Amino acid sequence: MSSTHQLVSSMISSSSSTFLAPSNFNLRTRNACLPMAKRVNTCKCVATPQEKIEYKTKVSRNSNMSKLQAGYLFPEIARRRSAHLLKYPDAQVISLGIGDTTEPIPEVITSAMAKKAHELSTIEGYSGYGAEQGAKPLRAAIAKTFYGGLGIGDDDVFVSDGAKCDISRLQVMFGSNVTIAVQDPSYPAYVDSSVIMGQTGQFNTDVQKYGNIEYMRCTPENGFFPDLSTVGRTDIIFFCSPNNPTGAAATREQLTQLVEFAKKNGSIIVYDSAYAMYMSDDNPRSIFEIPGAEEVAMETASFSKYAGFTGVRLGWTVIPKKLLYSDGFPVAKDFNRIICTCFNGASNISQAGALACLTPEGLEAMHKVIGFYKENTNIIIDTFTSLGYDVYGGKNAPYVWVHFPNQSSWDVFAEILEKTHVVTTPGSGFGPGGEGFVRVSAFGHRENILEACRRFKQLYK
């Protein structure tokens, strides 16, 4: 391996990593916030045409996998960042792309995990497999903290290793014969998991959409809430509020419309509330605040963006007892069977941390970290607003949605990366409705946020 390649390999790490600055940016040493300690080796994952295939099995590939377009959005961004570092090995790259938290987990939470880990080294404290649904005290704490007074019982809560994992488990439960609707733009895992499950048709490059998916267009003109009168009936409706990537939060009136729409069509809403604790106004933080939602909705959430658990992994899904299939069978019973078959329960160490999150001290600590990220969003919003751009989001979510009219999202992404060494996320990666937008994440150390904004001003002034 060449010395240059060794250097680059050592520099490609987490989204919060910083690198040595090019001279034209006049960056000070203090902006390099993190040590370059993680080494990542290159791994070939696909046979190239030049390689001779020695042997192949007789197993056919899942035809649905071939429908997927290129790579999943965030690994593709990481690939382009890596290529950029090969081109500019001395660049101080700042990542405001993937929504990965950067601030340390509060000590009140990590100390609980450390205590649990130590207990596992003792006869008295050791435990093996836990309940697949999660520890009873944690299920009770989640129900009380997030759903108190909403009719959600402890046994309606299923603890998991993250909301993204639960989305895939839900897709396995729903099977290949359901139809789905998604906000456009929306978190790409909804669509990609649907493609893998065989719920969709082929990808139409002319309109950048998959067949058999109802894309619910969300734009500045409609307040990022779809006109439901134009949306066809589907079995499943994926809905995220506050939304990733737009940052928009649905109002009580809008969610009431959504619940009524689902009831009229006999649909199930999969409500993603991963950013509910970022809400600054009085809009609903849970779909179950809407009367009747317990008959048509389930909710998935996570500690990832609240407590910095992106690596710790701990989330949950709520499925009320009143949510029934067309034959009257409870949806929760099928999900329970799925997790008992496909999952052995969340880590007991992670669950100890989650329980600490929901103590008064833990909640205070989480709100403090969330407040820090929201200050970052204000800095980003002020920057692009001062440059004359239309900016959305940020108030109720850690993402800022910036409009670059009449431009390709990937072109804007490439220009920003090339000229400022800042990684963002192209809006079109979230669906055709994201074309012409770029998502800027507020997850970052304050010095990096300020430096990135300085570079934005230098580029677009």
Swiss-Prot record:
Class of this enzyme? transferase
Q: What does it do? A: Required for lysine biosynthesis. Catalyzes the direct conversion of tetrahydrodipicolinate to LL-diaminopimelate, a reaction that requires three enzymes in E.coli. Not active with meso-diaminopimelate, lysine or ornithine as substrates.
Q: State what induces this protein.
A: Not induced by pathogen infection, but down-regulated by dark treatment.
| GO biological process, alphabetically ordered | lysine biosynthetic process via diaminopimelate; systemic acquired resistance, salicylic acid mediated signaling pathway
Keywords recorded for this protein, A-Z: Aminotransferase, Chloroplast, Plastid, Pyridoxal phosphate, Transferase, Transit peptide
Q: Which SUPFAM superfamilies match?
A: PLP-dependent transferases
What else does UniProt say about it? The expected covalent binding of pyridoxal phosphate by Lys-305 has not been observed in the 3D-structure.
Q: Which residues bind pyridoxal 5'-phosphate?
A: 129, 163-164, 187, 244, 275, 302-304, 313, 344
Q: What is this protein called?
A: LL-diaminopimelate aminotransferase, chloroplastic
Subunit description:
Homodimer.
Keyword Plastid among record annotations = yes
- Indicate which residues the UniProt annotation says bind substrate: 72, 99, 164, 187, 244, 344, 439
| Residues bearing the modification N6-(pyridoxal phosphate)lysine | 305
Pathway participation: Amino-acid biosynthesis; L-lysine biosynthesis via DAP pathway; LL-2,6-diaminopimelate from (S)-tetrahydrodipicolinate (aminotransferase route): step 1/1
Q: Which reaction does it catalyse?
A: (2S,6S)-2,6-diaminopimelate + 2-oxoglutarate = (S)-2,3,4,5-tetrahydrodipicolinate + L-glutamate + H2O + H(+)
Characterize activity with respect to temperature. Optimum temperature is 36 degrees Celsius.
Where found? Plastid, Chloroplast
The family classification in the record reads: Belongs to the class-I pyridoxal-phosphate-dependent aminotransferase family. LL-diaminopimelate aminotransferase subfamily.
Q: Give the pH dependence.
A: Optimum pH is 7.9 in Tris buffer and 7.6 in HEPES buffer.
Q: Which InterPro entries match?
A: Aminotransferase_I/II_large, DapL/ALD1, PyrdxlP-dep_Trfase, PyrdxlP-dep_Trfase_major, PyrdxlP-dep_Trfase_small
Task: Tell me the tissue specificity.
Answer: Highly expressed in seedlings, roots, stems, flowers and leaves. Lower expression in siliques.
Pfam family membership, one:
Aminotran_1_2
